[in-house]
Amino acid sequence: MEVKGEIYRVAGPVVTAIGLDAKMYDLCKVGNEGLMGEVIQIVGGKTIIQVYEETGGVKPGEPCVTTGMSLAVELGPGLLSSIYDGVQRPLHVLLEKTGGFIQRGVTADGLDHEKLWEFKPVAKKGDFVKGGEVLGVVQETVNLEHKVMMPPDKSGTVADIKSGNFTVLETVCTLTDGTELQMMHRWPVRRPRPVKRKLTPEKPLVTGQRILDGLFPVAKGGTAAIPGPFGSGKTVTQQQLSKWSDTEIVVYVGCGERGNEMADVLWDFPELEDPQTGRPLMERTILVANTSNMPVAAREASVYTGMTLAEYFRDMGYNVSLMADSTSRWAEAMREISSRLEEMPGEEGYPAYLSARLAEFYERAGVAETLCGEKGSITAIGAVSPPGGDFSEPVTQNTLRIVKVFWALDAKLSQRRHFPAINWLNSYSLYKEDLNDWFTENVAPDYVAMREKAMDMLQTESELQEIVQLVGSDALPEEQQLLLEITRMIREIYLQQNAFHPIDTYSPFAKQYKIMQAIMKYGDAAMDALKSGVPASEIIKMESKDELPKVKFEEDFDGSLSAVLAKMDKEFAALGGR
């Protein structure tokens, strides 16, 4: 039901209306052009609306109409491979309607209402179906079966259910109380979708990135943050996670970042193969593009839109990874709206409720038993862009209180061309202990011990670096000289990874383990040789050691590694270290 009021005041993206009988979070059409907005505050007879489009030229006295509905997304077949703006308008539809530059007041349906999908019923006539249970299935892509579910807030006995080709608006099921159900339903973005219960994460998200999988793993259903200064590799790391994570669905939210970065994703993903299925990566991806040149207020909507789409697929029992790049831009949008509302500012001008909003977002991630009895997960990975790389600023600090994995990007590493530029001394993962059993069973019994040994060595190296910078490495005892050489190998062979190399971009667990095992084998044999009287300089000069870094780029990895290890054994035997 539409209720009409009029605009009283305009302050940037915030519009105040009078005579509007609206509820909190109702959608409104603002001004003569019908700009989309959302009610964020009601004070006395005044309704305050944040507008998701540019408000230039909107003036007091123009009409303002409430739709009586909250900001909701359309959920149903046809979501995958889509690219939306922050309020689920498909960008290709907007392109057809308005050309390259999006005009104001344009509306578009989130799903294609004309396309036919083959619906196969699962529920039968006479079945009592509760909210979240499966009515039927649609084969959306070659590898993904889209489960058409009863909306979570409805239930009833099936009176009639159809089979065949239908659009998302046609009725496929009728309940005994007369309720007609379609393949599509709408869900408010600010309301988390219900689940039976939350579960403890038990499996790692396999990313194919050695430093992440090996040293700082994130669990499926976990939360992680990637803070870092400009140019340190946040977006490339996020894109690597989008490409190679072993989840069935990836939702990539480009929130206030450059448009070129979304263009990169659109350019690369259709050409890249998913290592799990061999199909184009775009088939499992949904993009929510809310770039830096789009209106500020829509950034907030884009984060909630992305999370609601992720929850929908989680409810089907799929594992979803959600990339938010960058949460700092979302926080800056909150700061702007807050200042327009003349609220009391908190630290650095951010609103006092910043930490509550961030927590609200990350808490919607997790592993859950869904209403249909399946087990699904959402892994939320948020990039943070602190000004000047200052991790003490409010967005980074509030994010670190919430997330369990911290991948700290370091400008100094990126300047040295060490990528991924994740600082192994500042980063941490609180899932390590929970995932140790999985690594022991699925990778190797000595995997955890090897990882801890490597971390201890890297820690010792950082302590020795201060002495080395003062007096040089030659002044150190030979044992410590060897340790520095081994840690250099860990850094350059294991931790460094080329995102743009066709082979090195993705490293399976078996390969990661063998690389680390080879480095440790060299380290143990080198220490034994040193104890038996071989000078450290002789051990460091070995040819096989210098061939080891090339192995990770070879297609025949196992064959190349075996040849290098055999050569290493001969060289150590010649030195008399064994």
From Swiss-Prot:
Substrates-to-products reaction catalysed: ATP + H2O + 4 H(+)(in) = ADP + phosphate + 5 H(+)(out)
Topology versus the membrane: Peripheral membrane protein
Predominant location: membrane
Broad EC category: translocase
Keywords on record: ATP synthesis, ATP-binding, Cell membrane, Hydrogen ion transport, Ion transport, Membrane, Nucleotide-binding, Translocase, Transport
EC number(s) from the headed UniProt entry: 7.1.2.2
Sequence positions that bind ATP: G228, P229, F230, G231, S232, G233, K234, T235
Any one biological process term the GO annotation gives: proton motive force-driven plasma membrane ATP synthesis
InterPro entries recorded: ATP-synt_VA_C (IPR055190), ATP-synth_a_Xtn (IPR031686), ATP_synth_asu-like_sf (IPR023366), ATP_synth_asu_arc (IPR005726), ATPase_a/bsu_AS (IPR020003), ATPase_F1/V1/A1_a/bsu_N (IPR004100), ATPase_F1/V1/A1_a/bsu_N_sf (IPR036121), ATPase_F1/V1/A1_a/bsu_nucl-bd (IPR000194)
Subcellular localization, as worded in the UniProt entry: Cell membrane
Gene Ontology annotations for the cellular component aspect, listed alphabetically: plasma membrane; proton-transporting two-sector ATPase complex, catalytic domain
Entry GO MF terms: ATP binding; proton-transporting ATP synthase activity, rotational mechanism; proton-transporting ATPase activity, rotational mechanism
Lineage top rank: taxon: Archaea
General function of this protein: Component of the A-type ATP synthase that produces ATP from ADP in the presence of a proton gradient across the membrane. The A chain is the catalytic subunit.
Quaternary organization: Has multiple subunits with at least A(3), B(3), C, D, E, F, H, I and proteolipid K(x).
Assigned protein family: Belongs to the ATPase alpha/beta chains family.
The name this protein goes by in its record: A-type ATP synthase subunit A
The organism of origin for this protein: Methanosarcina acetivorans (strain ATCC 35395 / DSM 2834 / JCM 12185 / C2A)
Gene behind this protein: atpA
